[in-house]
Amino acid sequence: MSFNVIPAIDLKGGKCVQLVQGVPGTEMVSIDDAVEVAAGWVGQGAKTLHIIDLDGAFSGSRKNAYIMEDIVSKFDVDVQVGGGIRDYETAKYLLSLGIDRVILGTAAIKNPDLVRQLADEFGSETVMVSLDSKQGEVVIEGWTESSGKTTNEMGKFFSEIGAGSILYTNVDVEGLLKGVNEDPVRSLVNSVTIPVIASGGVAKIDDLVKIKNTGAAGVVVGSALYKGLFTLREAIDKVS
């Protein structure tokens, strides 16, 4: 299984944006045509697109759904979507658009039965659980509240109840372009039996190599690509 370098597309108000540490109003990059952005990543060799619906995350609105549908219909790549997916109906709706995988964060932690239900009905491969980790503990509600559980405990639990993969975000380094901390990624990979995708802090191509060496299945890259620190093509060539 080759290591997957996954470009992030954050949607807000129909545009592709990049926020610093997820804070509204801190857009570093805003590009009007998100479908064109997707086309660029696919053109450089992306096999998967990581779409976060910030309007969904901040307000529960699904006004960006038409963009996701457009991306799914135009490109023959895997699409995973997160951002405010808090219930079965929303997840089912997104999967009905042809999205390959829904990413559940706070909702999974507060209601693990949602993970079981979606895995039973649509297959484990459609369910990715997002574990946002701050100093080794999983945080929820947009990083404002600690779950009181370690990342490894949570990872093991979700891998046992039906999640098909885990998205691990190190909140301590997310969006800051300061580099990755590979130790917690390796530790999580060794605690679970399902693929782990890492996210947060990638600033240079060497960071991708570090993540690959942990045994993770892939890495999500956002800020570094949008700031032009390296190209997606260079990244894929380096780790493939």
From Swiss-Prot:
UniProt-listed CDD domains: HisA (cd04732)
Cellular compartments annotated: Cytoplasm
InterPro entries membership: Aldolase_TIM, His_biosynth, HisA_bact_arch, Isoase_HisA-like, Isoase_HisA-like_bact, RibuloseP-bd_barrel
Record carries keyword Mitochondrion: no
Entry's Gene Ontology BP terms: L-histidine biosynthetic process; L-tryptophan biosynthetic process
Protein's pathway: Amino-acid biosynthesis; L-histidine biosynthesis; L-histidine from 5-phospho-alpha-D-ribose 1-diphosphate: step 4/9
Active site: D10 (proton acceptor), D132 (proton donor)
Gene Ontology cellular-component terms listed: cytoplasm
Pfam families registered for this protein in UniProt: His_biosynth
Keywords: Amino-acid biosynthesis, Cytoplasm, Histidine biosynthesis, Isomerase
Coiled coil: none
Disulfide bond residue pairs: none
GO MF annotation list: 1-(5-phosphoribosyl)-5-[(5-phosphoribosylamino)methylideneamino]imidazole-4-carboxamide isomerase activity
Reaction(s) the record says it catalyses: 1-(5-phospho-beta-D-ribosyl)-5-[(5-phospho-beta-D-ribosylamino)methylideneamino]imidazole-4-carboxamide = 5-[(5-phospho-1-deoxy-D-ribulos-1-ylimino)methylamino]-1-(5-phospho-beta-D-ribosyl)imidazole-4-carboxamide
Keyword Secreted among UniProt keywords: no
Superkingdom of origin organism: Archaea
EC number: 5.3.1.16
EC supergroup of this enzyme: isomerase
Record HAMAP family: HisA (MF_01014)
Similarity-based family: Belongs to the HisA/HisF family.
Name under which the protein is recorded: 1-(5-phosphoribosyl)-5-[(5-phosphoribosylamino)methylideneamino] imidazole-4-carboxamide isomerase
